[in-house]
């Protein structure tokens, strides 16, 4: 694996992790030891956002590899090429990590919501299964585990496309349970969040696929980049619009109605993080479009334009991912 590819991956993980921790402290949402007896300790509380981040990164890796096989590296006629088969195997490996994180997240979530040490959850098994968030994580884990097994030896783009549909289905349960109340603005926010998660995963996963497989063929790189540009353009619009709708619904829920949206936006930690995240995504949309348009014509002449394109997008995307996890932890 090229050194710059490793550096890009490690850098993205570090940036996302730092953004998550800094945002949690800045918003006052960092896990705390409440000093109670019999509940989960501080370590378990910190595991929740960290597992969410690991799960998100694994999701991006799985989605990116599948998108690469189905869209970026598409070969006319159906069968996957060498890089396409490699991408499918990578997607299977990422799906295994995603499934493990989902199951571990279910255990940690149950421990926190039921205020029970992990070691004693077996005594409250039925209670844990009754928690919507836990059920959603278990459903996700089962779907993703089936995905990992099913796509392991896929040989055609159509079969890999079915894997994409399963991956999308696995994103829905946890997104749906993020807004359990029934007010109109909460229902709207929940529906928009589902679209937001799918679009964001497609966009970020597409970039991951571009970084991982885009330079496998120097002569094919402009074509791969053009395909990624189309995916990124559609996904970025969907991410922005669905994110704004979801955020508006969440702010209405926090403020008590549509007329009180500005109160939590200007005077709440969630509102501050939301503004930073929106700014990061707007910056990402503008910069990525500018870099792709300027560097596209020079790709065949050298490697620097390619890494200039993905470097900027990776940095801002990793920052936005960390902020997204922090937002999900901010009440």
Place the predicted regions along the sequence by residue.
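Polytopic transmembrane helical bundles with strong interfacial aromatic enrichment
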Residues: 1-331
């Amino acid at each position: 694996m090229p050194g710059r590819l490793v550096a890009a991956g490690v850098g993205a993980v570090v940036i996302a992790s730092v953004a998550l921790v800094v945002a949690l402290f800045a918003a006052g949402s960092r896990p705390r030891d409440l000093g109670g007896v019999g509940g989960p300790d501080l370590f378990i509380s910190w595991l929740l956002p960290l597992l969410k981040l690991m799960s998100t990164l694994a999701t991006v890796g799985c989605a990116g590899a599948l998108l690469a096989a189905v869209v970026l590296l598409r070969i006319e006629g159906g069968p996957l090429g060498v890089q396409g088969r490699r991408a499918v195997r990578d997607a299977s490996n990422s799906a295994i990590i995603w499934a493990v994180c989902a199951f571990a997240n279910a255990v940690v979530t149950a421990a926190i919501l039921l205020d029970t040490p992990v070691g004693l959850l077996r005594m409250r098994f039925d209670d844990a299964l009754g928690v919507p968030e836990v059920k959603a994580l278990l459903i996700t884990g089962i779907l993703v585990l089936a995905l990992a097994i099913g796509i392991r030896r896929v040989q055609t783009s159509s079969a890999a496309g079915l894997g994409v549909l399963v991956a999308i289905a696995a994103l829905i349960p946890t997104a749906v349970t993020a807004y359990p109340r029934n007010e109109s603005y909460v229902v709207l926010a929940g529906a928009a969040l589902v679209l937001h998660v799918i679009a964001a995963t497609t966009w970020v996963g597409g970039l991951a696929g571009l970084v991982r497989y885009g330079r496998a063929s120097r002569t094919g790189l402009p074509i791969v980049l053009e395909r990624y540009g189309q995916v990124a353009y559609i996904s970025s619009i969907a991410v922005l619009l669905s994110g704004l709708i979801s955020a508006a619904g969440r702010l209405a829920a926090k403020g008590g109605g549509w007329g009180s949206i500005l109160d939590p936006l200007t005077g709440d930690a969630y509102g501050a993080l939301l503004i930073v995240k929106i700014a990061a995504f707007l910056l990402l949309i503008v910069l990525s479009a500018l870099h792709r348009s300027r560097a596209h014509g020079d790709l065949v002449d050298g490697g620097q334009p390619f890494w200039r394109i993905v470097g900027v997008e990776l940095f801002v995307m990793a920052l936005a991912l960390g902020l997204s996890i922090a937002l999900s932890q901010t009440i």
